[in-house]
C-alpha cells in the first residue's frame, strides 16, 4: 500500500512555485508533502518535472512537464531523450502535447506504467485568484502600473547582448507601462545572473521601467499586462493561454550554444518581428488589440485544457490510481505498439545510459567520476590529434 506522502522534486524557483500550488491541494486531501531539490530523494510518491529524473528512488512516480514548450526542437518525440516508461503516471498540459504523444505512443518509452492523462497546465490554476478584482487592483498598485495606459511585458528565455536595453528603448517612445520580468536563474548560471544585474543597474533609475523580482510568478506579471515580448520563452505560450498577444523578436540571439543561435519561434500563436521593427509592431498590436487578443483567446480555447482547475484533476487521478478506485478520468489510448527503429533504439539506449552515468553514478561515486573524467580526457586527446 502506497502511503499518502508526496515528495515534489524541483530544480529552480519556478518549478517550486508550481509544486507549492499542487502541494496545497494535496494537503487538503490528507497527503503529507515535501518539497526538495534533492533529485536522489527516497520517497513514497515522487513527483517529477525535470528533463532528467531518478524515479527508481520512489515507490510510485508522477511525471509532468516543467515547460509548456519543453524540448521544442525535438518535437514530437521528446520521449526519445526523456522516456516516461520508468514512471507510473504522466500528465500532459494541452491538446498540442496530446498530439505529440499520440505520434510517439506506439513506442514503449513514451508510455508510463499506468497511463498518460490530459490534465492541463497547473500554473494556470492561479488564474482564479485574479477573478477577484480587489486582489488584482492591489497588485497593480503595489508594482506601480498606470491603469490608464496599456502595459507591455518583457520576459525573455535568456538575457544577453543587451536585449533588455533594446526592448526598453523600443518602448520608451510609446505611452505604455514598461515591465521587465527576468527568469529566476540559479547560481550555476553565472553569466545570466551577471547580465541581468547589469541590465537592472542600467534601468533602475528610469521611472518608466518597472523591474519585477525575478522570483515573481510569471502569470502574475502576464495578468496585469496587455502584450508580452520575448524570443523563444514558454512565457509566450502562457501569455496566449491567458488571451494576451505574444511577440517573438526573431533576431534576438539565444546563447545556449556557441556561436549563439536565432530563437526557435516558429509557433503558430506568436507575432514575429525583428528588433529594428519592435516599436512599430507594438503600435500595430495596440491599434488592433481586439483582433490580436481574440486570436490569442481562440488559440487558447482550442488547445488548452481545464484552465483554472487542472490541479484538482491531477489529484483526483492520483487518488484513484494509488487507492485502486474507479477513475473518472480516462487515460489516453496509445497506438498499437511498434518496435523502435534500430537507429532510434540505439540512440535512446545510449542517451539513457550516458545520462544515468553522468547525472547519477558520477555524482554519487568518486571512483566513477574519476573514470569518467579520465575517459573524457582521452577522448579529447584523440580528437585533438585527428584535428591536428
Question: Locations of the language-model features?
Answer:
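Conserved catalytic-core segment of nucleotide-activated headgroup transferases in glycan assembly
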Residues: 2, 7-10, 15-22, 122-198, ...
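Active-site and donor-binding regions of nucleotide-sugar-utilizing enzymes
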Residues: 4-133
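Structural alpha-helical scaffold elements that stabilize or flank donor/cofactor-binding regions
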Residues: 39-40, 83, 170, 220-221, ...
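A donor-sugar binding/catalytic signature common to diverse glycosyltransferases
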Residues: 57-65, 215-258
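Catalytic binding pocket for nucleotide-activated donors in carbohydrate/polymer assembly enzymes
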Residues: 87, 106, 110-113, 118, ...
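C-terminal amphipathic helix plus adjacent low-complexity
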Residues: 276, 280-388
